[in-house]
Amino acid sequence: SPTQLDVYFIVDEHAKVEVRKITFLGNRHATDEDLRGVMATQEGNWLSFLTSAGTYKEDAFERDVLLLTAFYYDHGYVTVKIGKPTVEMSPDKRFLYISIPIEEGDIYKLGKLDFQGELLLTKEEMLAGLKVKPGEQFNRSKLGQDIQNINNFYKNRGYANVNVTPLTQIDADKKIVDLTFDLQQGKKVYFERINVRGNTKTRDYVIRREFDSVEGDPSNRALIDRAERKLRDLQFFK
C-alpha cells in the first residue's frame, strides 16, 4: 500500500570460516607448539566439524595476544613485544591464515629484592616469606602469587584496604630486574556489626555462630572466607 514499505533481507550464508594455520614470526626460543598451546584460538583439524576447534573469534584472538605476552613474562622475557597480527583469508573465503610477529628479547633474572612503606614485619622476615628469589628467572605469575600472599597477610590482620605495588627497575646491560614491594596498609578496619539479610531458613544466631570472630574484632579475610564455607556446608543457602 502507499503507506507501507516492505523490506526484504537477502542473506548469503557461507560455510564457517576455519583457522587453517597460525604462524609465529621471530620466536627464537619458544617453540610454535608452546605458543599455540597457550592460545584459545586453535588451528582446525579433521574433527573441527564436531567441535569449535579452528573457529575464529575476534574477542578470543585479542585475549590470545595477552596470553602470549603472559607466557613470555613467565619465562623471563620482560621486554617481549607481540606485534600486530595479520589475518589473511583464502580466495574461497573458507580459511584464515594468521601470522603473529614476535620480538622475544632476552631472558632476565631477578636482582635485588626489597620492601618499603608500612611493614608489619621486619624486611628480613618479609623477604623470607617470598616465593621469588634473587638470581632466579623472572616469572610474573610467581610474582603475582607473592603479591596475593602479602595482600592476604595484611587483610587477615585488619588492613582490608592494603595496597601492594611492585616497583621494577630493569638493568638492560646486566639483564636483571630489581624489585621493590611498596606497601600502604591503610586504616585498620574492625567488625562493627555482623548483619544477616535475606535469611528465611533458620534463626540468625545459627548463622552468626559460624563466624569465628565477633563484633569489635579486627577484620580478617581468612575468617570471612571460612565462615562462608561453613554456611555453604549447612546447605540452607545457595
Task: Give a label for each model feature.
Residues 1-234:
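Interaction-mediating elements
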